[in-house]
Amino acid sequence: MVLVATLFSLFTVSLCRSIPRSSPSSSPYTQATDLKIHDPTVINANGAYYAYGVGEHIVIHQAPGLAGPWKQIGSVLDKDSIIPKGDRAKPWAPTTIEVKGTFYCYYSVSNAGCRDSAIGVATSQSPGPGGWTDHGAIVQSGTGQGSDEHPFNEVNAIDPAVLVTGDKGHLVFGSYWSGIWQVPLNEDFSSVGNTTGLNAHHLAKHPKTERVNSQDQNPDPLCRDSSGRRPVEGAYISYHAPYYYLWLSWGQCCDYDPNNLPPSGEEYSIRVGRSESPHGPFVDKQGKELTQGGGELIYGSNNDVYAPGGQGVITVETGDILYYHYSLYRYSTHSLYTFANLDFNQGCTLFIQ
């Protein structure tokens, strides 16, 4: 209860008055859980909570509650991904959902800084380890089947999330380049059908980072964006009537050097927009579309919290919970998991009518 109350206070402040990193003392300290995880996805199934994250064959943790204690119980895959590209041993940014008794774990394979990527899926009748079947790639960018079709010829196909509306599934994905996209899944929730003429929706795009780094000069066209770096990724869509909320991880992610951090404000932060349609357009508090660089800053670095992101939303009996990972200023190489209540009744998603 202390953890939830403290985090709720934090979000009452941060959601209503977007706290800048330059004023870390204005935000309470986040209460850490015992779970070290990057890009978590959390579900409630069979009377327990399961967290899936980046790690060998997609690591699974289990806990009796969101606050833990968390215990590593195994992995989704029992061997490397069958997709022949990227980091097959440690797939990125998994998202797990349950539809009609089947569990679907969507994952990414890629190499850092390049868009020769793919999103795959594994299925099981149980949320825990064992019994998962790897079905391979759903969509690909850079190379592979369908990668020359719109929008896959301009996106980085990683960071999957799936929104379910009725009996329909919508695959949300993207990182840097042209930003965040959504395409419809087939009824099997494991394929998108013919990629030619696919009904794709553009959801968000970063306006461009002016600062130049070595990646901008990479001779491989799949490992640079000639229009400039556009750091937005990790999208997730939640629903709280009457709006759909598009949550984004905005800024530079991962592998921070505590002695050489990015310029203030360029590290990960959580932003959001909303729409009455699951396909957008999503707008921020000022009415700016997220495809035009909009996005309300909900939570950024403060106190000892550095670069929060990799967020998702889970609905429990008490309401909607936003979970995310973050690093510590003093030791920014590990990602920690925590969560906070979302209070829509108080207007604390920054959309105060």
Swiss-Prot record:
Site location (Important for catalytic activity, responsible for pKa modulation of the active site Glu and correct orientation of both the proton donor and substrate): D159
Region ranges (Disordered): 202-227
GO BP term, example: xylan catabolic process
Reactions catalysed according to its record: Endohydrolysis of (1->5)-alpha-arabinofuranosidic linkages in (1->5)-arabinans
Predominant subcellular localization, coarse grouping: secreted
Keyword Hydrolase listed: yes
Enzyme class: hydrolase
Active site, per annotation: D39, E233
Entry keyword annotation includes Hydrolase: yes
Segment forming the signal sequence: 1-16
UniProt keyword list: Carbohydrate metabolism, Glycoprotein, Glycosidase, Hydrolase, Polysaccharide degradation, Secreted, Signal, Xylan degradation
Known EC number: 3.2.1.99
Gene Ontology cellular component list: extracellular region
GO MF entries: arabinan endo-1,5-alpha-L-arabinosidase activity
Pathways per UniProt: Glycan metabolism; L-arabinan degradation
Function: Endo-1,5-alpha-L-arabinanase involved in degradation of pectin. Its preferred substrate is linear 1,5-alpha-L-arabinan.
Family that this chain belongs to: Belongs to the glycosyl hydrolase 43 family.
Name of the molecule in the record: Probable arabinan endo-1,5-alpha-L-arabinosidase B
